[in-house]
Amino acid sequence: TAMVGLAQWRGGMTATEQVYATPVGQRDSVMLPDGSTVVLAPGSRLTVASGFNDGNRAVTLEGAAFFEVKHDGAHPFVVHSRGAEIRDIGTAFSVKTDANGRVAVAVTHGIVAFRDTTAGSAAPVELRAGDRGVLQAGTVAVTRGTVTAEDMAWTRGQLAYRDAPLAEVQADLRRWYGIELQVTDAVLAQRTLTASFRGDSAAQVIQVIALALGAFGAGPAEGAAK
């Protein structure tokens, strides 16, 4: 299996904190003791709190994951990630982070409460099926009804983008290919990408991105798209 983890269940709950990690280029799934399932993206890390399923259904994410949560109104499922808190209200949703501190949440069904925990008592924003929320620089921006099948394509082994910021693409390439996409032109760096990849080599991905941006693309050995 692609996932590396240490788990100890006791009486239907976690006896100790557990960490699940996926290597670059490989995704995997795990079922939590409450019946919720998680698809963990490549190069990602999920920490499950000790005592999970004993009134405390909290996890911490670095990277990206898709959560299919078994609803329990008395014990909400909470994801912590880069200063963000995503609280389930009976939901399936994805969470993705990037190196710029951006946390993006896409809801496929149900409702989540999304808030910035670095802002003290900031009120949560409610996201419903089809909604997208992005936390960056202390601000949560919401777009309603914009989530599509492309947002979850990575759970099926495909990277699909529609007007995606390059920071999101860069984070995915680190996780899936272990490469660093460098955009040395400030104007190009502000552009977005619409493209999809399945089974492409790192060199092919770089060339497609370079063409889409109207730039010269160097292969992974050179480490840049200029």
Identify the role of each PLM range.
Residues 2-226:
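A residue-level detector for the "anchor" residue at the start of short, highly conserved motifs
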